[in-house]
Amino acid sequence: MKESELIGKVHSAVCHQCQQRGYAAPADVLVDVGVLPKEKYEDWRFGKVRYLEAVCTCNLKKLSFIMKQIRSYAKKSNLKPSFCYYKRWGVKKKHGHKPVIPLRFSKSGNPEIEKAYATHYVDLGRAEQLKKEKMEKAAAVQAGRLDKTSGMPEINISENNNG
């Protein structure tokens, strides 16, 4: 894939994610771009893979380029960086609580690289709009229930005057 095609795919993936949910996550961009199979991502989340880079289908140079393009698009689009702590899925409770097992993104474990992968980019305007839409939808559902019953259970009264 040409560099220009890859840039387009990365920018498109970030834009699409922001439209869908108000933020973009680098790991999801890697899935969308096609360099991280979804099943391998899930294996990593469940702790079956030591680090995320190991299951990506491209070399570290290309991964680094993709990460740079994500940051570039985020800066250009005024997306707010927000660190997200990634922990293992499917951890069983011990002594009443789940132990938190952090996930690793890179082979090196370099804190700057780890932070770059774990940083989500938030479209504050779109996130607020999605939150508002969700609240309006919940209110409409609630209002629909109340309209049908006028806040009270429906009672059918029939009069039989056979007198």
Go through each PLM region and give its residues.
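Alpha-helix boundary/N-cap detector
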Residues: 1, 5, 9, 58-61, ...
